[in-house]
Amino acid sequence: MRTKTLLGLTLDELTSLVQELGEPKYRAKQLAEWLYVKRATTLDEMTNLPKALRSKLKSCCTIGRSPVALTQVSRDGTEKYLFRKLDRPDQTFETVYIPEEDGRATLCISSQVGCRMGCRFCATGQMGFHGHLSAADVINQVLSVPHSDALTNVVFMGMGEPLDNYKVVASVLEIMTSDYGLAWSPKRITVSTVGPRVGLTRFLEEQRANLAVSLHSPFPEERAEIMPVEGLFPIEEVIETLGKYDFSGQRRLSFEYIVFGGLNDDLRHAKALVELIRPLRSRVNLIPYHPIDGLPYHASDRAVIERFAEYLNAQGVIATIRRSRGQDIDAACGMLSTLKPLS
């Protein structure tokens, strides 16, 4: 049997594994508890499993826990962690921990090394695509960061397009929200996306986590200039798809709108944005652009962003301005990149 990584396996997958090893099905729940509740890092810790089973597991499996390789701490308390990919230690990806003064804490996790969506304003997009993360790589971020027990929210807003790696993201969402796993409410989790057609439809049909759609311009031609995927997944088609689903319950829909100075921050854009998303029960997160070396974009003035938000709210579209966090350590929105080698 080929070496298998236990972390990231769903209960069904663990059940198949223990049955292949000639063990009863209930051992799978015990194994899941050790992996996701007790967070074991070695098989020897799993003391309620028979020694014979532990021996079998050692011969065919590894746990798959991976420690943080590098930590950076921002002046505002944000922390950025570098992880190595389990099957390719030469490849790395980043995770961001964002504590709030009210006691909440959000973890921004990655789903790919780099990204193939190619957004022209994004440091991750400039990396190109270097591979999908495994379910073990993704759930390990949640389990292995220093403040894991303090987390109140997880957002798939790190490196990569989550719905381009849908199968893995779906497994992680199951583990995070199931009783055998972390037992989180889906409303504590948000998945961000540009809206790839197949992944978006599957997510809307199968998941109950919150959805955040990267919009950034209400005009297709202009959006295509900064987001080449507009040609593959037109925003109007994404809006049409979203309109088929109910967001009046616990699952929330939001639109991410990075505000660029002189590009998408005027009244014309605000009016078009209202018209585009008015049919949907949603909100808009306005995100100040974080300048990246070598890219031709700059941030909009705070007063301009505030006027933009005021207009949206006056038109009945709930809009908030996201506070920038971790900019001094390149941990803010759009700044994650591992092109530089480990120091």
What role is predicted for each listed range?
Residues P99-D137:
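Canonical Radical SAM [4Fe-4S] cluster-binding loop centered on the CxxxCxxC motif
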